[in-house]
A protein has these predicted regions:
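Transmembrane alpha-helices that form the ion-translocation and gating core
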Residues: 1, 109-144, 148-149, 155-158, ...
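Juxtamembrane helix-boundary/capping and inter-helix hinge elements in multi-pass membrane proteins
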Residues: 51-56, 64-67, 95, 131-134, ...
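Signature of multi-pass transmembrane helix bundles
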Residues: 1-137, 299
């Protein structure tokens, strides 16, 4: 038998936006309110930039702190498979085998949405309409980068290959060298799509109805959470906690999705890197730095 989830009241859009601003940054850290933490981190970062050399010691401290936590995270990840097995066994035991159907729906929805977004928005609208490059030519040129990122699930690791493909589209070196590395950190279209799909998955598994207005709020939060997500495998799953907390959905969703995250990751990274190239094409076109005659993709 299944155990129903006792849903909390879902906050309004206005409440969610207001809750992003922390009244006490240390309380946000202790309660793991990630949206408030990100907001405060942005303010602190801007302040340190304005301080210039005076802020250098603090920046050095945070860089060392970041590297230390990366090492700790790597150690923890070694034990992740055992933890995921235990968590999934617990969730399935509580809620029954019915949770398997939403898995199939989630994988299908994630792949279909990412595919349509990549083909029609990035390839058709951005590269085709705004960039003036044939979508067929665009995707032929991007083929290597797409296959590589599909296998590695890392947009950061794909930067060199994405740079090569983008320059083969006729984008100038100075535009490509700026847009592609920047986009690998800031432009996470696929991650935003995945997080929205994951929330719908959670609502189905735990029997929580989300209104259209609440789904729009989830989409806004997903976009905010995806900005700056690390371009490495599994980072989208970590940032999903922000979106789940925003609508008071159970964090057990992370355990349920962890087992299929690699499959979902393979889909969501493609819009990330294709979007970077499409943006580079649009920017290059607007700046007169796009040279279609240099495109090396075969017709």
């Amino acid at each position: 038998s299944t155990t129903p989830y006792d849903a909390k009241e879902i906050p309004s859009v206005a409440e969610t936006l207001m809750n992003i601003i922390p009244t006490n940054p240390f309380n946000a850290l202790s309660t793991q309110n990630l949206l408030q933490i990100i907001f405060f981190a942005l303010l602190l970062g801007f302040a340190l930039i304005k301080l210039g050399d005076k802020g250098a010691p603090v920046l050095d401290f945070f860089r060392a702190w970041t590297e230390a936590w990366k090492e700790i995270t790597n150690i923890v990840l070694e034990f992740t498979p055992f933890g995921v097995f235990g968590l999934m066994a617990d969730i399935v035991g509580k809620y029954g085998m019915e949770v398997m159907l939403p898995y199939i729906k989630t994988i299908g929805a994630c792949y279909l949405t990412c595919f349509l977004f990549t083909i029609f928005v990035q390839g058709g609208l951005m590269a085709g309409v705004y960039g003036g490059i044939s979508p067929v030519k665009f995707f032929k040129t991007m083929k290597e980068a797409i296959l590589f990122v599909f296998a590695t699930c890392s947009s950061v690791a794909t930067i060199p290959l994405n740079l090569k493909c983008t320059k083969n589209l006729g984008v100038s070196d100075k535009i490509a060298d700026f847009v592609i590395p920047f986009g690998a950190v800031m432009n996470m279209n696929g991650t935003a799509i995945y997080e929205a799909v994951a929330v719908v998955f959670a609502s189905q598994v735990f029997g929580i109805h989300l209104t259209v207005a609440q789904q729009v709020m989830v989409m806004v939060t997903a976009v905010l959470a995806s900005i700056g997500t690390a371009g490495i495998p599994g980072s989208g799953l970590v940032m999903l906690t922000i979106v789940l907390n925003a609508v008071n959905l159970p964090l057990e969703t992370i355990a349920l999705l962890a087992g299929i995250d690699r499959i979902l990751n393979m889909a969501r990274v493609i819009p990330n890197i294709v979007g970077d190239a499409a943006v580079a094409v649009v920017v290059a076109k607007s700046e007169g730095e796009l040279h279609p005659e240099l495109v090396k993709a075969e017709e």
